[in-house]
Amino acid sequence: MSILTIHARQIFDSRGNPTVEVDLKTSKGLFRAAVPSGASTGVHEALELRDTNSKAYMKKGVLTAVSNVNKIIAPALINKNIPVTNQAAIDKYMIDLDGTENKEKLGANAILGVSLAVCKAGAAEAGLPLYRYIARLAGHEDVIMPVPAFNVINGGSHAGNKLAMQEFMILPTGASSFTEAMQIGTEVYHNLKAVIKREYGLDACNVGDEGGFAPNIQDNMKGLQLLEEAIKIAGYTGKVEIGMDCAASEFHKNGKYDLDFKNPHSAESTWLSPDAMANMYKQMISKFPIVSIEDPFDQDDWETWPKLTSSTNIQIVGDDLTVTNPKRIKQAIASKACNCLLLKVNQIGSLTESIEACKLAQDSGWGVMVSHRSGETEDTFIADLVVGLCTGQIKTGAPCRSDRLAKYNQLLRIEEELGTAAKYAGKNFRHPKV
């Protein structure tokens, strides 16, 4: 089945910034994909092409990337006449067309938009639901429903409070299904709102980019205490565990970590050494039901990562460290830096490379968590992706804001469609049994 037309346009993400949307037509219909973008981006990510030479949209326009799809990728792909079911060949052709290591010529946002639209068209051609088609591309015979990691307290670059760490998450690992996980997650979320309102007032219930609350606290331990209290009030102690995304690259300064980095006058004497940070994490793990910590150190602090990973049995997730890039993942595997990959399709810029990164991590005994970005759209691709890749865990924000709920609602539909065949990862979310 050949591609008839490809058309890209500039739309807006959940933060009001421009992003790329691609429409692809085959004889089976029109298939649309939109590309997300991040706030705390790793320096090693594939290049998201922005119109930095234009003042429009605060220099964040994507008309160059859109033009690259319409004037370069579209005619070349249509002329090449590769079947839409040959995802790997189409992705490789676009990567070769770009010819740079980090996709800086055409833009990772241009290539990814086409790549995701091709996948949706391929699923239709194969007569399969998108999640089943992705499972086939990844070589999986079965699929699994993921544990959602709801980001319910926002800090770091995602919120205007003083909290250094970016995300405090709840994982309903004790649920028996994804549907029950949604019930547990939303009930804890609403109880958390009541707790925050009681302690800090109504304006502390404003939400951040990903739908989590952003109370003006600075003590990270306090964030964990608020979660623990909300879980207890909701009646789910033991059924809900805690995850964190520290995004430590954001507050890494001169080899140390500044937990007061949003204060321009923060005292250097209070900055923590890498070992002091590691000890703080160990303290947190001993006091709270923490099962996952993401980016606990700077993206190039290769020396400190393995120390924490080897000294704890919880999940240590690489995001800015690995940026879904096979080269960085191999380096992290060799140095035993972490034991889980955060998978973001726009960090690497094509579906085929995302699947390769996922399999590389899984083959090394790592867990894999599929993730949204802080600048999201109504596109639900990652919901089908996490089910098809059988990773067992997804983070796509709080149960609040339509750009986040779109993914969770799609997962509810998938579980409903699977019926009695649906399996929920639960406590085995790190290494789900397919």
Curated annotation (Swiss-Prot):
Alphabetical list of Pfam families matching this protein: Enolase_C, Enolase_N
Cofactor annotation: Mg(2+)
Location in the cell: Cytoplasm
Residues holding substrate: H158, E167, E294, D319, S371, H372, R373, S374, K395
Assigned GO CC terms: phosphopyruvate hydratase complex
GO MF, any single term: phosphopyruvate hydratase activity
Assembly and oligomerization: Homodimer.
Protein's UniProt name: Enolase
Gene coding for it: ENO
